[in-house]
């Protein structure tokens, strides 16, 4: 199944005021949407595999992994029906419907809830798009809730369909980890592309800095801040998964989660490194602009220094005194220009000798 790219600039969420609503009230908070919600059911074990559209709750069985994917959390009625089927806590459903959540992990009697930001980089416009993904691990199933159609899980679908790796022989908890790991892997893709952009921007600022260069530096600052806000809470979430015991997750999965935690640390270190590089680019830009201004001022100063003596001579012989001896010379005008030429050449040679030119 091919997934069409659908990442675009994220609009500012048009939030519903939920401040004075009772806890557990399910209200959609996020970008206004009118598209139809799409759902998908993937069922598999070591020997069988099926993938169909829709939520096939009648086929929920214990001897297989049941993955239910919902693209679109603005349909509150659908969320309530799914919540009734899996006995999902109302507070959890409230978090799923709120797409402005901070990445976090919560443990409920019904299962483990993971909120995570899915990141995509648009190289054409140099923008980061983030989308909230809610992953719920229960005793019998894994549920994923996304804001819209399309995701970074196609590699997992292919592994399941082609029985590659250990995913077909593992349980719901391994799928829970694999989904998180796929999202984290795409952080690396975004970071690598941002790193290449920083290298190109560094060359641009060094060769020919302009106003657009500073705007690009400021844009980089915002992108890296977006990554930082997504990855720091995720590190805390995985750390909590590693520390706390849960009947829904086997201890063997924690070795894989430790690897995901290490990846988060690596991403954080890279992001902080890029933030320092970006700050250095800003300083480089300001230094380059200052150096260019100094060069312009140097040229103007040298030109002024050369013409000041000539202006002095012209001022003397332009005075309105009646008796100025040189004014009566037959070749006085020629001598004036010869004198100006000598001063010009002398000052030019002096500046060259001082290496000011």
Give residue ranges: language-model regions.
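Peripheral, non-transmembrane regulatory/ligand-interaction domains of membrane transport proteins
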Residues: 1-243, 248-250, 256-259, 263-268, ...
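Hydrophobic alpha-helical transmembrane segments and their immediately adjacent juxtamembrane loops
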Residues: 2-8, 262-357
């Amino acid at each position: 199944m091919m997934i069409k790219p659908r990442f675009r600039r994220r609009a500012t969420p048009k939030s519903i005021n939920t401040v004075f609503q009772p806890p557990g009230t399910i209200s959609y908070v996020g970008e206004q949407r009118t598209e139809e919600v799409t759902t998908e059911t993937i069922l598999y074990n070591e020997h069988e595999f099926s993938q169909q559209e829709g939520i096939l709750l009648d086929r929920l069985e214990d001897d297989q992994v049941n993955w239910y994917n919902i693209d679109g959390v603005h349909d509150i009625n659908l969320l309530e029906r799914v919540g009734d089927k899996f006995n999902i806590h109302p507070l959890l459903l409230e978090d799923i419907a709120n797409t402005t959540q901070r990445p976090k992990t919560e443990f409920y009697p019904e299962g483990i809830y993971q909120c995570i930001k899915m990141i995509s980089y648009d190289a054409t416009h140099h923008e980061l798009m983030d989308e909230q993904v809610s992953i719920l691990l229960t005793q019998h199933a894994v549920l994923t809730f996304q804001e819209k159609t399309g995701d970074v899980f196609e590699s997992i679908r292919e592994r399941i369909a082609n029985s590659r790796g250990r995913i077909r022989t593992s349980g719901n908890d391994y799928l829970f980890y694999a989904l998180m790991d796929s999202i984290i892997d795409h952080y690396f893709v975004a970071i690598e592309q941002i790193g290449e952009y920083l290298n190109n921007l560094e060359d641009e600022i060094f060769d020919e800095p302009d106003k657009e260069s500073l705007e690009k530096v400021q844009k980089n600052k915002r992108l890296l801040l977006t990554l930082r806000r997504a990855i720091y809470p995720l590190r805390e979430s995985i750390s909590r998964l590693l520390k706390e015991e849960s009947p829904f997750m086997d201890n063997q999965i924690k070795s894989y989660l430790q690897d995901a935690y290490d990846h988060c640390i690596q991403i954080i270190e890279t992001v902080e490194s890029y933030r320092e590089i970006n700050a250095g680019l800003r300083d480089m830009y300001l230094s380059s602009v200052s150096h260019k201004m100094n060069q312009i001022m140097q040229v103007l100063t040298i030109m002024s220094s050369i013409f000041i003596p000539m202006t002095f001579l012209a001022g003397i012989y332009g005075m309105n005194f009646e008796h100025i001896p040189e004014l009566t010379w037959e070749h006085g005008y020629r001598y004036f220009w010869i004198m100006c030429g000598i001063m010009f050449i002398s000052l030019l040679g002096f500046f060259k000798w001082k290496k000011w030119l």
